[in-house]
Structure formats: structure tokens, C-alpha cells
């Protein structure tokens, strides 16, 4: 989870445009899976449940819950997980929030992230610093590399000659391996000045 969250954050935050950090992604918070549809509040979920599970029987309760977990809106609307206290520190014990707190809050919460120097939170902080310190993230043209590659998503941010002369930065290479497999790549012909950020110590 941690390595994947760092990778996804890196891919998004080093692209062109204005990035935003939304609803606990800087902690690596995950979608929730409730085993009772009553725990969801989204009206579309309850409408679909009534149509396809209760009335027509076209979809089993188990399959619908899996679908909701993957595609529903409430799965990412759970309360912010601040610490491992009751309700994840979002509200006092005995107070019922609009949605239940994700049951994984004892492990995934802001306090735990602050206590772990290798957490998703600190990677996001590094991403923000990188954007501030390297103008190419703001000015560089986006160039997708090898769009046929089904394992690796890689792109360049490339400065114009004028911006490169002003900043000393010609190109920034971003590589994201979406698999568990080790891959060998040679996008830059071996000509890399430095690695500015990585989510894995296995990089070589």
C-alpha cells in the first residue's frame, strides 16, 4: 500500500497542471469495504441495491457489495483518520459520524504517518518540495514514453531551450512500474544526472 500510494502520488504530482491533495491521500488512506449496505449513505447506492438486489434479483448481495466497494462514491468519503483513538480521532467516542470510520484507522492515520519517516505523508512533503525547487515541474512540456508498455508508465518533462538556459534543467524523467516485476529500462540511454525522488530502495 505505501509503495503504491507513493508511486501514484508521484505520477500525478509531477505532471503538468495544478495538483491537489484530497481527503487523506497523503496518508495512503484506502477505500472502505462495508459488509452491510446500510452503512453507506449514497442515494445512488441504495437505489441500485433496491433495483438489482431486492426487486429484480439480477445481482447477488455479495457481488453488489464488491461493486460498491470498487465504484461507489462513499468508499472514499469516510472520516479523516487522525489517530488510533475512537473514531480515528475524527469525533468523540459515542458520537456517530455521517459515515463509519474505515476499520483500518488504527494502522492508517495521521499520527502513525508522522511517526514513520518512510510514510506516504513524508513522500508527499518531498513531492511538494521538489515542485518548489525544480522549475521544470511547472514549465516543462509533457512527453509520454512508450505508450504501448503495459507495465510501466513513464514520461518526460522537457524544458524549452530558453527555460533550460535559465534554470539549468533540461529534462525530468518520471517512471512508474505498476507491477511487482523488476524491469530494466533505458529511456535516457544511461545518461541520468541524478535520482531526485524514489518510492523504492530497490531502484538501481
Segments the model singles out, each with a brief description of its role:
Residues 1-204:
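Active-site and adjacent substrate-binding regions of carbohydrate-active enzymes
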Amino acid at each position: 500500500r505505501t509503495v503504491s500510494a507513493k508511486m501514484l502520488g508521484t505520477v500525478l504530482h509531477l505532471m503538468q497542471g495544478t495538483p491537489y491533495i484530497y481527503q487523506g491521500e497523503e496518508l495512503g488512506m484506502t477505500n472502505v469495504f462495508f459488509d452491510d449496505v446500510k452503512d453507506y449513505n449514497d442515494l445512488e447506492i441504495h437505489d441500485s441495491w433496491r433495483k438489482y438486489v431486492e426487486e429484480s434479483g439480477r445481482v447477488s448481495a455479495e457481488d453488489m457489495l464488491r461493486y460498491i466497494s470498487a465504484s461507489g462514491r462513499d468508499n472514499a468519503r469516510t472520516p479523516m483518520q487522525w489517530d488510533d483513538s475512537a473514531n480515528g480521532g475524527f469525533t468523540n467516542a459515542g458520537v456517530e459520524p455521517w459515515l463509519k470510520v474505515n476499520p483500518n484507522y488504527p494502522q492508517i492515520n495521521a499520527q502513525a504517518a508522522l511517526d514513520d519517516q518512510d510514510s506516504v505523508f513524508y513522500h508527499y512533503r518531498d513531492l511538494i518540495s521538489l515542485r518548489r525547487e525544480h522549475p521544470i515541474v511547472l514549465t516543462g512540456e509533457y512527453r509520454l514514453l512508450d505508450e504501448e508498455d503495459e507495465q510501466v508508465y513513464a514520461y518526460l518533462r522537457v524544458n524549452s531551450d530558453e527555460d533550460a538556459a535559465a534554470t539549468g534543467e533540461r529534462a525530468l524523467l518520471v517512471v512508474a512500474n505498476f507491477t511487482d516485476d523488476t524491469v530494466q529500462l533505458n529511456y535516457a540511454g544511461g545518461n541520468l544526472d541524478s535520482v531526485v525522488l524514489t518510492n523504492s530502495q530497490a531502484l538501481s
